[in-house]
Amino acid sequence: MLNTLVVFVGAGLGGALRHGVNLAAARLGGSFPAGTMIINIAGSLAMGLLTGWFAVRGGMPQAWRLFLTTGILGGFTTFSTFSLEAFLLMERGAFAAAALYVLGSVAAGIAGVGASLAVIRQFG
């Protein structure tokens, strides 16, 4: 129960942080999704730092790891988890699996959004 609570609180903080970055990026103007790009890159950098730190330091309580990675970074961006998983596949030499994971996730994600929008636009 404690782990679920710390993930819940962390996700709320990460989501609020994401909203703040998007608001700040919107002030730059333009139609390019700079906020999302900044969030995805920053989240991926943070995921690498935290994962590496946990591995080197060890002894970090599970609740803290969940709060920081699954909670805050999960609320901030799921792209950081996607990036970590793709990197770990490549690091293990599973290049075909990594390519399938990256290309499949992106292609299926875009197709899913497109199909859902088409249904709503047609029948919504």
UniProtKB/Swiss-Prot annotation:
Quote the subcellular location field of this record.
Cell inner membrane
Whether Cytoplasm counts among this entry's keywords is no
Q: Does the keyword Cell inner membrane apply?
A: yes
Purpose: Fluoride-specific ion channel. Important for reducing fluoride concentration in the cell, thus reducing its toxicity.
The UniProt keywords, alphabetically, are: Cell inner membrane, Cell membrane, Ion channel, Ion transport, Membrane, Metal-binding, Sodium, Transmembrane, Transmembrane helix, Transport
Reactions mediated catalytically: fluoride(in) = fluoride(out)
* GO process annotations (BP): cellular detoxification of fluoride
Q: Which residues cross the membrane?
A: 5-25, 36-56, 70-90, 100-120
Gene for this protein?
Answer: fluC
Q: For Na(+), which residues are the binding ones?
A: G74, T77
The protein's name is: Fluoride-specific ion channel FluC
> Which species expresses this protein natively?
Methylobacterium nodulans (strain LMG 21967 / CNCM I-2342 / ORS 2060)
